[in-house]
Amino acid sequence: MRRLWVATSWEDVKDKFATYGEYDFKEMGNCGAVTYPKIEKKASGMRGVLIVFNMNSNMGGSEIVRTVAHESVHVANAIFDELDIAYDLVNDEHAAYLVGWVAKCCWKMLQKDIYKD
């Protein structure tokens, strides 16, 4: 089983996760969002993928939609890669469903931050 975590702040995740991949788990600077594959939550040992959105990047409207779509594809590819699940340009229905589910999860989390005032 793999989990998806979505955060809107590096501060919320920096001490709670570690990578079991071949990269350093660190803040990625000036970008709208970053997907961290092969991530493990320290407290539970659960493994999955983490997306961290940078809500200080002044993203709005269509830029949020673009970023969610972009990161959703990264998440789907990371999960399929780790679980050795293949898809191609003709046999991609399962990938489309996973990308849609990831996008919905992102939007649920982002709404809390966008409409908090």
For each feature predicted by the language model, list its residue ranges:
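Acidic, glycine-rich loop-and-strand cores that form catalytic or ligand-binding grooves
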Residues: M1-G21
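Short, flexible coil/linker elements and helix-boundary hinge sites characteristic
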Residues: A18, E22, E82-D84, D113-K116
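Active-site scaffold of zinc-dependent metalloenzymes
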Residues: T19-S62, V75-A78
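Residue-level detector of short, conserved catalytic/binding motifs and their immediate flanks
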Residues: V49, V65, H94
